Amino acid sequence: MPIKVLSSLDVARTQWYHFKAIIVAGMGLFTDAYDLFCIAPVMKMISHVYYNGDSINTAVLSTSYAIALLGTATGQLVFGYLGDRVGRRRVYGLCLIIMILSSFGCGFSVCTTRRSCVMVSLGFFRFFLGLGIGGDYPLSATIMSEFANKRTRGAFIAAVFSMQGLGILVSSAVTMAVCVAFKRSGGGLEVDAAAPTEADLAWRLILMIGALPAALTFYWRMLMPETARYTALVENNIVQAAKDMQRVMSRSHISDEATTDPPPPPPPPSYKLFSRCFFRLHGRDLFAASFNWFLVDIVFYTSNLLLSHIFSHYSKKPSTAENVYDAAFEVAELGAIIAACSTIPGYWFTVYFIDKIGRVKIQIMGFFFMAVIYLVAGIPYSWYWSKHEHNNKGFMVLYGLVFFFCNFGPNTTTFIIPAEHFPARFRSTCHGISGAAGKLGAIVGTVGFLWATKKMESDDKNQIYPEVNRMRIAFLILGGVCIAGILVTYFFTKETMGRSLEENEHDQDNNAESEDEPQIVDGQSSVSTLLQTR
């Protein structure tokens, strides 16, 4: 009986509720991207306000970037686990509340000692901001995968993730608008060491605006019912699952497919998380999802840091002509160009092709083309690209393709695959583990890049700079990371296109039974039991 109810999800036509779920779930990813990527121009403004235009100390800068990523990794682990323990819906709203409060907290990072105390306060609130952002990752992916039908599930999850591209674009647009407005109001018109006092308000305003999209969707997120798969397979409440599906899918006959008797107590799971049986059944999938996410985030976050330094290196604008607003505007403008020309198209190419050619092929293709681009840019960098200014546009276009193939490739598929591989009672937890591994890769790429490119000058000041040999080495290392991603994907990642979430678990349980494991024979998984009712 339960399998009939869940089959209704897999064969359901695309309805308005699917698009509503994309918007509600995607707005969390929109907020995530806004908050994580607005920090680059904000740190540029802080360097003028609190450091008199000098580069921020490398230790402070790397900590500022890493603290939110560390919070994100923590949130993915904690809220991913809670999503399986107490339900997706109950935890979903809590993540949004944390993001809203932390965004406002970042804007109110004030203290009498100014520089040091403000940075500590900002880091404190950005950790909790990352905590909420991290929780949103596994919950958004899991909720969308469990609501979607199997024909277009990949496109729906990719559409949710594509809201990150819009978040990056809006983050850049808001930053540019704030900079223009404050500059025209009279502050920062001249090039001087001391930034106007209004600039201290400008960067705070940019951070606090990030709370608005989350606040606007909080009401709609609270109206979302629990997913039918969690209710049916984890709570074993088939009647409630049918009622929830009837509410959102406009199918009155769904409730007739469910029994009207009180639901029996849920059967004990045949194996526990991180048990020997779990690793035998799902260890390969968890390794592939986690390691691929780790690799792609090294590339993605390092590429974003390299971006501003590469383009400023090729830019003909004199660096001495920047004031506090121009400095932040230039960084935001660059982010907007990349988002509009490379990042967003990459996301939507994935939305269109993900259910046509599959997750694995797109992931391998993305890693492959990124590896080619990095090697083509890296091998001749010291003797060609760095010495031929007439090719600067060609180099910028080439480097922009990295972001296209990253998003029409592993950056999106690593978000999708963990939401499809694992049983319902472990799905959110395993997605959180995979995402946390990715954020550890982001920390490695971010902190490693900042320290690898640190330069000590005669006046003992630190600054980041595109030194030729180190840039070449960075490109070659990133190319090698992409090649590693190809190998891990090819040998360890399994395709999930066109298959229901239950079919994936059913096949794995059948494999376990064929090996005559007493643990599986004595207690089958809940999905295997449901499938036998056909």
Swiss-Prot record:
Q: Does the keyword Phosphoprotein belong to this entry? A: yes
Q: Which InterPro entries match?
A: MFS_dom, MFS_sugar_transport-like, MFS_trans_sf, Sugar_transporter_CS
Renumbered to this chain, the signal peptide range is none
Could you list the residue ranges that cross the membrane?
22-42, 62-82, 91-111, 124-144, 154-174, 200-220, 282-302, 334-354, 362-382, 397-417, 432-452, 473-493
What the entry lists under PROSITE patterns is as follows: MFS (PS50850), SUGAR_TRANSPORT_2 (PS00217)
Note the SUPFAM superfamilies from the entry: MFS general substrate transporter (SSF103473)
Which UniProt key words apply to this protein? Answer: Membrane, Phosphate transport, Phosphoprotein, Symport, Transmembrane, Transmembrane helix, Transport
Gene3D superfamilies assigned to the protein according to its UniProt record, in alphabetical order: MFS general substrate transporter like domains (1.20.1250.20)
* Compositionally biased tracts (Acidic residues): 510-519
**Induction text:** Slightly induced in roots during phosphate starvation.
Subcellular location as annotated: Membrane
Topology feature Cytoplasmic, residues: 1-21, 83-90, 145-153, 221-281, 355-361, 418-431, 494-534
Q: What is this protein's tissue specificity according to the annotation?
A: In roots.
| MF GO annotations | symporter activity
Origin: domain of life: Eukaryota
Q: Give residue numbers for the modification (Phosphoserine).
A: 514
Q: How does the UniProt record describe the way this protein sits in the membrane?
A: Multi-pass membrane protein
The GO cellular component terms are: membrane
Compositional bias per record (Polar residues), positions renumbered to this chain: 522-534
Query: GO:BP terms for this protein?
Result: phosphate ion transport
* Annotated region (Disordered), positions in chain: 501-534
What is the recorded function of this protein according to its Swiss-Prot or TrEMBL entry? High-affinity transporter for external inorganic phosphate.
Question: Which family is this protein grouped under?
Answer: Belongs to the major facilitator superfamily. Phosphate:H(+) symporter (TC 2.A.1.9) family.
* More details: Although related to the sugar transporter family, it does not transport sugars.
Q: What is this protein called?
A: Probable inorganic phosphate transporter 1-8
Q: Which organism is it from?
A: Arabidopsis thaliana
